[in-house]
Amino acid sequence: MALQPASGVRDLNPQQVQRNHELREALAAVYRLWGYEEVAPPRIERMDTLKAGGAIDSRDIVRLVADEPLGLRPEMTASIARAACTRFQNRRRPLRLWSHGTVFEGRQADEGGLCIEEKLHCGVELFGARGVEAELELLSLLMASFKALALPLSEPPQLLIGHTGLMQLLLKNVDEQDHPAYRNCLTQLDRLALRELINTQPQHAHLQQWLDRRGAPDAVISQLKDAFPDAPVLQQLTRLINHLSPLAETTGISLQLDPTFQPMYALYDGIVFQLVCRGTSSPVVVARGGRYDTVVQRLGARGKDATGLGFSFCVDDLRDLPGAFAMTTSRTDRILLCYSQNSSMEQALQAQAGLHRRGLSCQVDHHPCETKAEAEERLREAGCNSLEWVGD
């Protein structure tokens, strides 16, 4: 019999589960305030849904052995978008939904086998919202949600913002057949590969400068406007940054704009972003999101409301940030109920029911005690902080 969990997954102790619940409820309270309604997408989906029309590589999906192609969800956006385009298609737009649940990310382990990473996520999706107004709401909600967590971080988190339209600007003079090669070099910051491409196409040497042009949004937008005047995407980003800057300052978040930033999954076709915190040994992405209109359209939505955008926090990664676990985890008063040899388990259960009716947490020790002093010794062993004695 196997005594260890599968590669990539782990058991959570009661304190970790409680902390996950606290973080999830803190996020959910903000989502509800903003008018978002909870949904529960399935963990198992058809592969064509999980791949989001080719936006997610099938190698990132954990497949199930079944009569039809099924898999475990690597993220929740595709499942919720499917529901929004089918079961919820007649509901009024904008449609605001939030969800929480486990996602399963498949990756190649060091020894060559499949490693499944199981993570708890909690996020929102906004359907049928057009224009920069939708991005204004979504990123404002991200800020408000993170602020509600009140995490004691030693360094300010960084909100990294990109836009697929910026990459299109950078590559607008590159032959379309060469876009994938140049895009990979820029997004992966691969200077050597980019230099090799430029050696054969020297007219694109200017692309090298964009590998180093990331940082304060105002400065980056100014550089982009010099290179690409009157680009509509820059006007949208300017409006977005002007709104976010004061919010970021009050929330303690640093903003960074990167024209070459592209997310892990190719879901997005507009604004993209990720929130990065300092972890124990390296930076940790605790939230990511963006706009995914194309995915919604591939799932059958049509017309002006065929839009979608959202974000998701990784609750497990939030919990594991330095100081985040110990700060707000509260200890609930727990009562240990012990009974003497002259009493019975039935009497102890009746006494426990009375405490439960008062809303008190109480557990019964199944074995009678010879003395109350013995019960007090069991109290320390049980991890409870008060004793209820049934006896003489």
Curated annotation (Swiss-Prot):
Q: In which pathway does it act?
A: Amino-acid biosynthesis; L-histidine biosynthesis; L-histidine from 5-phospho-alpha-D-ribose 1-diphosphate: step 1/9
A GO molecular-function descriptor: histidine-tRNA ligase activity
- UniProt-listed Gene3D superfamilies: Bira Bifunctional Protein, Domain 2
GO biological process terms, semicolon-separated: histidyl-tRNA aminoacylation; L-histidine biosynthetic process
Which InterPro entries does this UniProt record tie to the protein? aa-tRNA-synth_II/BPL/LPL, HisRS-like_core, HisRS/HisZ, HisZ
Keywords associated with the record: Amino-acid biosynthesis, Cytoplasm, Histidine biosynthesis
Keyword check for Cytoplasm, yes or no. Answer: yes
Q: Which Pfam families does the UniProt record give?
A: tRNA-synt_His
Localization per record: Cytoplasm
Coiled-coil residue windows: none
Q: What's a single GO CC term here?
A: cytoplasm
Family, similarity comment: Belongs to the class-II aminoacyl-tRNA synthetase family. HisZ subfamily.
How does this chain assemble?
Heteromultimer composed of HisG and HisZ subunits.
Q: What does the miscellaneous comment read?
A: This function is generally fulfilled by the C-terminal part of HisG, which is missing in some bacteria such as this one.
Summarizing the function annotation, the protein's role is: Required for the first step of histidine biosynthesis. May allow the feedback regulation of ATP phosphoribosyltransferase activity by histidine.
Please give the name of this protein. Answer: ATP phosphoribosyltransferase regulatory subunit
